[in-house]
Regions:
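Conserved RNA-binding domains used in RNP assembly and mRNA/RNA metabolism
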Residues: 2-96
Length: 96
């Protein structure tokens, strides 16, 4: 039997899930398969993405986040999941 989905009201400020909202600033690798001069290669920089969502877990190896969820009587289903190696994380800020 398919699960019924509920919409979560954007005006509902309740904290009905036991996960903190966070903003994670991190570094990521980039790659480019095109030809480049040494000057162009020297200008190459790492990507600096920012992710906002709920902190699912964090340990020495990785940080796990999710940006959407569905909660009903059967529990929580997580969506938009991201797993980042902990050494790549530069800053974690708790959001209110």
């Amino acid at each position: 039997m398919p699960r019924k989905r509920r919409k979560i009201s954007l005006t509902d400020k309740s904290t009905d899930i036991p996960y903190p909202r966070v903003r994670v600033e991190w570094i990521d690798c980039i790659s480019d398969s095109s030809w480049a001069t040494d000057k162009e290669f020297d200008k190459m920089k790492l990507a600096t993405p920012v992710h906002e969502g709920w902190l699912y877990s964090k340990d020495k190896k990785s940080i796990k986040l999710f940006a959407s969820y569905d909660k009903d009587e059967d529990g929580i289903t997580f969506g938009d999941r991201t797993m980042i190696p902990t050494p790549w994380v530069k800053k974690v800020t708790k959001l209110s």
